[in-house]
Amino acid sequence: MFFKKKQKHYEPFDLERPLLSFAKNDAWTIRDACEGTQIFGATGSGKTSGSGQAIAKSFLNGGFGGLILTAKKDERATWEKYCYEAGCLDALFIISPKSGYKFNFLDYELNRAGDGAGHTENLVSLFFTILEIAEQKSGGSSDPYWERATKQLLRNTIDLLSIAQGRISMMDMYKVITTAPLDYEDVQDTEWAKHSFCYQLIKQAKQKNLSHSKKMDLDFTIRFWLNEFPNLSDRTRSIIVSSFTSMADCFLRGVLRDMFCTETNIFPEFTHEGGIILIDLPIKEYGQLGLFAQVLFKYIWQQAAERREVYKNPRPVFLWVDESQNFITSYDQQFQTTARSSRACTVYLTQNLPNYTAALAGGSEARAKVDAFLGNLQTKIFHANGDHRTNTWASDLIAKTWQYRSNLSSSMSNDGKVFFPETTGKQSGVSHSEALNYQVLPHEFTQLRKGGYKNNLLVD
């Protein structure tokens, strides 16, 4: 008598619930998704339309919420199609200049739920994430001194505004920094004091009834603006000031001002309830503006995902980043170390390893950062690729095994009998050896199918 094996029932967001099946007994589960995914493949290899599409649709069909960053103009249409086919088009929120969705990131960070809301260091980290990506793209210095000095500038700007007026805006930060004293003559000049927004805030803050802790913060802030800042060399001051103002300038005009510095009617937390947020500011169209906006929203979304109480709402959320070399920051590695416990499913797609190294300004330090980040993405998918470093790295990941080899040898000899070749002798033998070799050789990745009609639309 034969009994049919009872199919296991899974709760919708059970970590062991299969999302995809690669073979009869090889399921890719929600748990696997939460451990992060990296997809490599050359242009035209099928990484987006092949494994990328399969994973994306499994997330949508599974009821996941998510954030999608865009590098190319056609990505919005692609995801609209995916959502329509999955029956969740109504859950798709598109942030674009014409959509009407706005996100005042400073107001959000000051007023969001949680004990960390409004803390100066959190706001400094938020700004520094944008500054980091700007420095990466410009090939700027990564000298720790400039990082510390810029953070000090931001910290004292935020504290002064927070204590004096109880609110912070990008424009007010800009005004504080650009009206600060440049030397001790300014500090003693009554005419400068009369017209300096920075000095007027200092006067206003002194009149506040503050706690002992806030008084100490204000004292340090005043010392910075009236003693330390004007004592900086012109070169040092100009570098740290321009680090902020060159970035802030983008948020003080046009698209970024209207979308990210006015009001808030969309929140990262929408994704925790199954919403899908797509930022339609592709960098191929909007350039640096699109990059700054998306990196900013990604950072805030990552932190919101880490703060949520998964035991109350176990719905997985995903972060989808195609052409991911454009959007990678140092915080990604830190986020990925705890993403599984937050049920955050990161999917990054790029052509090759050198893309990441170049994005992080190259060098051994950049390689170490890339290795640390990729080490925390447990699922790695390799499509057709012509990059030697990526293919060799893939072969190393798959590892080597001990393989047996047999060698057949033969030889012929006539022992010097020139006149009687028919007496020639023949010898043969077989030898065996064991060697440690790649299971998949690097060159095999160059031969994978890329789809198209000549491959019957199949992608390896």
Q: For each of these PLM feature ranges, what is it?
A:
Residues F2-D14, P18-K24, W28-A344, E444-L458:
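P-loop NTPase motor domains
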Residues S141, Y145-A149, D159, E269, ...:
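P-loop NTPase motor core of the ASCE superfamily
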Residues P282, Q351-L353, N385:
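Histidine- and/or cysteine-centered catalytic micro-motif in compact active-site loops
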Residues D74-R76, S99-Y101, L353-T357, R389-T390:
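Short gly/pro/ser/thr-enriched loop/turn and capping motifs at secondary-structure boundaries
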Residues A71, L349-N352:
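Conserved H-loop
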